[in-house]
């Protein structure tokens, strides 16, 4: 079985388990468009989107390695912001950004918030901050996720934070598939930039 066939099988298995396209996209570190293509592949006239699959489960499933990469993310952000005011809260994007944000918040003794993006909402209307964690209003917030694929989720949370009177001060990711320096004026701090060469 080819890696494409394996990816299609994973997407179809997750879909059969009841996951939404947005949840599958997060699980496989792909765009929603790519997941849609994987689920409908074989239908005439649908061209494959340009995307890159990143499998980082060797790190994400090992708390020692996950802690190490979280520390690297925090160190990268802090090195670029030595003169700036601090951060009050770290916000993890559900699902993969949550463990990273938790470890970063614990390392620096910061509040933790969790954002559920609109793509996880069955109606797909709006995203929200979990009420079980830190409030974000009037706080300087560091946003954490595993990967920038399209940037839509990060644009969504930046706008959400501003509407709720919070100040997004940075976006930390492990992988950036877009090669962006900022999203909506908020600086991006990525450990790795992934570029597709066609």
Curated annotation (Swiss-Prot):
GO terms for biological process: pyrimidine nucleobase biosynthetic process; regulation of gene expression; UMP biosynthetic process. CDD domains: PRTases_typeI (cd06223). Coiled coil: none annotated. GO terms for molecular function: DNA binding; orotate phosphoribosyltransferase activity. InterPro entries: GfcR-like (IPR022854), PRibTrfase_dom (IPR000836), PRTase-like (IPR029057). Keywords: DNA-binding, Transcription, Transcription regulation. Belongs to the purine/pyrimidine phosphoribosyltransferase family. GfcR subfamily. Contains an N-terminal DNA-binding winged helix-turn-helix domain and a C-terminal regulatory domain (or effector binding domain) resembling phosphoribosyltransferase (PRT) domain. This is Transcriptional regulator GfcR. It comes from Methanocorpusculum labreanum (strain ATCC 43576 / DSM 4855 / Z). The gene is gfcR.
């Amino acid at each position: 079985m080819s890696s494409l066939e394996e990816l299609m099988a994973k997407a179809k298995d997750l879909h059969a388990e009841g996951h939404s396209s947005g949840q599958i996209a997060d699980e496989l570190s792909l765009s929603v468009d790519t997941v849609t293509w994987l689920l409908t592949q074989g239908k005439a006239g649908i061209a494959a989107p340009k995307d890159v699959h990143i499998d980082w489960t060797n790190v994400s499933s090992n708390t020692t390695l996950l802690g190490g990469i979280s520390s690297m993310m925090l160190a990268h952000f802090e090195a670029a912001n030595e003169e700036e005011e601090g951060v009050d809260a770290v916000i993890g994007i559900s699902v993969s950004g949550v463990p990273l944000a938790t470890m970063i918040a614990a390392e620096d003794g910061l509040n933790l918030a969790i954002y559920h993006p609109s793509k996880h909402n069955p109606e797909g209307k709006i995203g929200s901050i979990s009420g079980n964690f830190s409030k974000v209003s009037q706080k300087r917030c560091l946003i954490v996720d595993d990967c920038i694929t399209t940037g839509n989720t990060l644009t969504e949370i930046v706008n959400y934070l501003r509407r709720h009177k919070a100040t997004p001060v940075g976006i930390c990711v492990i992988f950036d598939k877009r090669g962006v320096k900022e999203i909506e004026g908020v600086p991006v701090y990525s450990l790795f930039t992934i570029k597709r060469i066609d």
